[in-house]
Amino acid sequence: MIKISKGLDLPISGSPINTISDEPKVSSVALLSNDFIGMKPTMLVKEGETVKAGQKIFEDKKNNGVYFTSPAGGIVKDINRGDKRRFLSIEIDIKDTEEFINFDMDDSVDQIKDCLIDSGLWNAFRTRPFNRTPGINEIPDAVFINCCDS
């Protein structure tokens, strides 16, 4: 075991370059079922349909009113299903000119909640102990905030 106290000096020569390089653009994105435990989707789009970034793609059958939105604008390429038509993934080919949906939000609690639901950000909330997306009418007893990416 290595113990470090009072920092560590790394022998790196030179200094960082202050430029932003043009990396290749992403051509397609996908929503994977493994990211959403226990979710059963009701599809709101079809293959070949054009979607905007932030547009509702599917709704959770088990949790009515909880929507999942498109991470990018483009054309729905594939809706992949497995055994017994189990949802596996939905693939979207990104267009060069991306369109997106604007979400307006005021200071009221109901409008903030509606914005979170409509934009698909409600899915970032998790219930304990089973790590599921909370229902839209549930009121939590406590909110835990984790500032570490794990």
Per-range role (PLM):
Residues 30, 42-44, 67, 91, ...:
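Structured core elements
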Residues 39-40, 61, 101-106:
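Aromatic/His-enriched, Gly/Pro-containing loop or helix-boundary segments
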Residues 16, 35, 49, 96, ...:
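A broadly conserved detector of short glycine/acidic/proline-rich loop/turn motifs that flank catalytic sites
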Residues 1-44, 59:
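N-terminal, Lys/Arg-enriched amphipathic/low-complexity engagement segments
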Residues 52-64, 88-96:
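Short hydrophobic beta/alpha edge segments that flank linear recognition/processing sites
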Residues 35-39, 51-54, 63-64, 68-78:
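Generic structural motif
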Residues 45-51, 80-83:
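Acidic, glycine-anchored pre-beta loop/turn
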Residues 80-150:
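Buried, small/hydrophobic-residue-enriched core segments of structured protein domains
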